[in-house]
Each structure stands twice: as C-alpha cells, then as structure tokens.
Amino acid sequence: MVDWASDSDNDKFEWDTDGEAETSSAPALRNIDAPGPSTRLPQDANGKANGSGALVAEFMGMGFPKEMILKAIKEIGDTDTEQLLELLLTYQAIGGDASVGNCSASACAPQTLEVDEEEDDTNWDEYDTAGNCDRTPHSDGSGDEDFFQEMSEKDEKMKSLVNMGFPEDEAKMAIDRCGLDAPVAVLVDSIYASQEAGNGYSANLSDYEDTEFSSFGGRKKTRFVDGSKKRKRYGSGPSGNQVPFDGSHEEPMPLPNPMVGFSLPNERLRSVHRNLPDQALGPPFFYYENVALAPKGVWTTISRFLYDIQPEFVDSKYFCAAARKRGYIHNLPIENRSPVLPMPPKTISEAFPNTKRWWPSWDPRRQFNCLQTCMASAKLTERIRCALGRFSDVPTPQVQKYVLDECRKWNLVWVGKNKVAPLEPDEMEFLLGYPRNHTRGVSRTERYRALGNSFQVDTVAYHLSVLRDLFPNGMNVLSLFSGIGGAEVALHRLGIHMKTVISVEKSEVNRTILKSWWDQTQTGTLIEIADVRHLTTERIETFIRRFGGFDLVIGGSPCNNLAGSNRHHRDGLEGEHSALFYDYIRILEHVKATMSAV
C-alpha cells in the first residue's frame, strides 16, 4: 500500500508559469493589465468560482467566438485562465478564427490521443485530399452536455499526477496530448518525454536533480531548488521496513551533463574509478535499467539496494538519431567495450534521407526526442497542413513556433509539401535497433506502445559487448520484465549464443513478439513466465539445478508499465507497482545465494 505523507498539512502547490501570453490579433482584445473586467474566473463571496458560464461570457466580451471558447475549455479545462487565453491566442495566430485556414473548429482543437483500434489502419494520406480544408465549421452542441463530466475526469487525472510530484501545467499538457482515456502510466511517459525535449522541464525543477558535471561525470557542483510541494512516503520494502522515497533521507544522485556514461564507441575510456563491493561481484552479472530523470532520491534508493553501485547515465542520442535518457546499474566490466556494427545513423537526415526534400529550412531538428508510446493523430497533421497552406512562402514566426513545438513533441517528420506525419512502427524499430517487422503482427497501437517502452538496443549492446569474450560457448540469461526482448536482441546482435533464457513478462502482446522473434532466430531454450510472482524461490532453485545457474540477470526499465501490473511508472518506484523493484532485488539475491551454495 502507498502511504502518502506530507511535510505539512498546509503545503500549497505553486507552479511556475511559462510567462505572459503573446500579443495577438484577437478581436477587440484589450490590455489585460489595464483597468476593466478581470480575466480571472469570477468568484463568489466564499472565493469559489462561479462556473464556466461566467468565464465564457468573459472571453466573449474580449471578442472570442463562443464556439472557440467552449472548444478550448473542453480541451484544457477552466482552472487556468491564463492558459486558456494563451490557447485562444494560439487559435488566432494560426487561423484568424476558430479554424485554421478553413479547417473545421473540431479539426483545429488542441491535440488529443486517438488510440481506438479503428485508428490502427489510419491512412495519413486520406487527409491530404483536395478541398479537405474547405469544410465549414459546424457543431450541434450535443457534445457540450458531457462537457463538465469530462472536465471532472480531467481534474481527477490531474490530481493524481500532481500528487505524484509533477507540476500542474505539465500534467495538463500531458492530458491534452494523450487524451482523458490515456492511462496514468502513459501520461507520465508523455511528461518525461516532454521534459527530455525541453518543453516544460524548466517549469519546476524542485523534484529533480540539477547538476553540473566534469567531462566524465565527477561532481563539480550540485544545486537543488527548494520546492513547497507535498512530499510522499512509500510502502514497505521486502523486509517490512518503511522506506522513504521522497529524497528527504537520501543523498541526491547527481545527473551528468552530457549523459555519455563511462565511454562512447570509438572514444577512449575516461578515467573511471569504479570499485565494486565484494557482494556485487558475479556470478551472475546483473544489469538494471531505469529512466534517468527520476524524482529526487529514487536513484539513490535503487543504488542503495543494488550494493551502492553508482549508475551509468547514458543518452541514446549518442548511439542513434533519437534521445533516450536512461540510467544503468550493473556489475559488468567497462573496459574493451565495442559497438554493434554497422553503427546506426545519428541524425534524422541520415536515418531517413527521403525527408530531406521536404524538410523546411526553419526546422532545425537533427535528432528526435524520446520516442513515446502515444502517437500524434491525423487531426493534428491536418491542422498543421492547413496552417502552413495559408502561406505561399515561409510561414510567420508564430506559425513556425506552433508547428515546431508539435513536431518536437510528437517526433513528426516531413513527408510532403506542408505535410508531416508520425514515425511508422518500422521506423521506430530502426531507430531503436530492432530488426524490421520485429513487432509486426499486433495492432499499430500496441506496436507504438511496446516500442515506446523498449530498450534502445545499440546502447544496451555496447554495454553487454564485454560478455562476448567471457562466454564464447553461450550463456544462460534470466530476463526480468523482458518487454519485447531488447536484451535478447542485443545479445543476438553481438553474436552471443543464448543457451537458455527465462523470460518474465506480464504483457501477452510482448510475450508473443519475443516468442515469434526467438523461433525465427534462436536455437536455445526460451521459457516464458507471465507473472513475476510465479518465479518463486523453489522455481529459481529448480532452474539453477537444471541449467547450471545464470550468467546474466537483466531487468527491463521499470518505466515500461505496459500491462498495468508488470512494470513501474516513469517516476521509477512510484505507485502500487513499486514492489516489482523489490522482486528484482529478491530474485537477484536468491540467484546469487543459490549459485554460491552449489
């Protein structure tokens, strides 16, 4: 059980804002700093809001159309009038009325995730037909009846994210991007991806570690911002003792900048002093991965449970054309590493040369941001096309900013004149180092979700490459929370024979993907276990007697919460599934103890 605690019952949440709304050509828009009707939501004598009706009237008095105001409130709620005003001004900047160009108001609403199975076969070209931007705005008002119910659902989602320590504005943006139906794990995924992209990471740094590093990663200076957020305490560890995860009892773990780990391919090894304690030495080797940008104290806790080994933080942008900030705790040797050949391209233009023809000069992106589990919808790409179609030459700076923000947020690529599209699953497979069609056979939605939660194979293979000479005759692997088999693919690409793999993975989709790949490429034994709770002490001992022990215990990223009960959220050890981290520790400890006794 999770026990939420607070340093003070009177804690207040105060979030930084991104600044004042930009000026725009909103009709009859007055100076919001001048005397006159307030832009804040009217309140009663008790200080409570009078409701959205008064807010609609307020913005209508400023000259915004009612349909546009209702659409904006429906998308982001009415709790933040400044953000509402900014959204309305954005509508003005990209269209001049509720539509962008002549697109319908509904098509120009802020982005929400569409993950219905009917969307799986979306033909992105169908929105590029002549006259598609000639639709006239229409609304029968039927959707407004459910309006306030949706807002209530959104408030509940926001409350959950805020209680997890995320800034309120970032929680709002994540819900806008992924939709109300998106699970909290997907929303957390989206927030971290946005933070890695720089879209809002500056909003509040008080829960994150901000550190300057030397060239290797030795600490030069660490600064922390004191926040006034509520603190959290988590439930029992494996021994039943209360373990705090709020960082209040932990020395913060510094994050290096840049995140290059102990070494990069084709670069000399940095001067690294890495003395592993005796209890951390193999057999077996172990390797544990988690998202780097975890809340303060989480990495210190993980390190403490894994023999006080310091994490190796790496951004996969040094291995491929997409960023992916991760931390790895392992007892592997760090000398004589070698990359998998051929090395993948590290820029978008090298990875997808066909995009060069359509890439505008005002789009400076050279690499993708962190690949997400949720994709942009066809409605968004249509809105962008309509916005750009209004200009015969270079669009205005306002429109450029709008388009670039969406392209960075959703990793959109240019596939035609004024036409962007999300990455296809096979393109994500290529960027992440998987063989083509590795995830083919399941729905598009499931492919995106699985790939967005997977290892970047080239990065992991570089770390595991030291095992090639140590196990020339093959190895036995215990793969915990295997996902779609990133570790197995990495070992295969290194030419390391896997004699036996015990794979623990809750998601049936992921197990199907791994089993299909295994049957096509491997000759060893694959044993799949659907629930980590089924990997009992007795079964571990049986496997060790049967196969002679394990050479590697490798754990998938706890941010990969595909099945809802198989992985942690992106905040590392947050929420009801935090016990899975202790399952990794429990299993590793028992493997080590049993093997030492054999």
UniProtKB/Swiss-Prot annotation:
Keywords: DNA-binding, Methyltransferase, Nucleus, Repeat, S-adenosyl-L-methionine, Transferase. One of its GO terms (cellular component) is nucleus. SUPFAM superfamilies: S-adenosyl-L-methionine-dependent methyltransferases, UBA-like. It comes from the Eukaryota. It catalyses: a 2'-deoxycytidine in DNA + S-adenosyl-L-methionine = a 5-methyl-2'-deoxycytidine in DNA + S-adenosyl-L-homocysteine + H(+). Residues 42-91, 150-194 form the UBA domain. The keyword Translocase does not apply. The keyword Plastid does not apply. Interacts (via UBA domains) with EIF4A. This is DNA (cytosine-5)-methyltransferase DRM2. The lineage of its organism: Eukaryota, Viridiplantae, Streptophyta, Embryophyta, Tracheophyta.
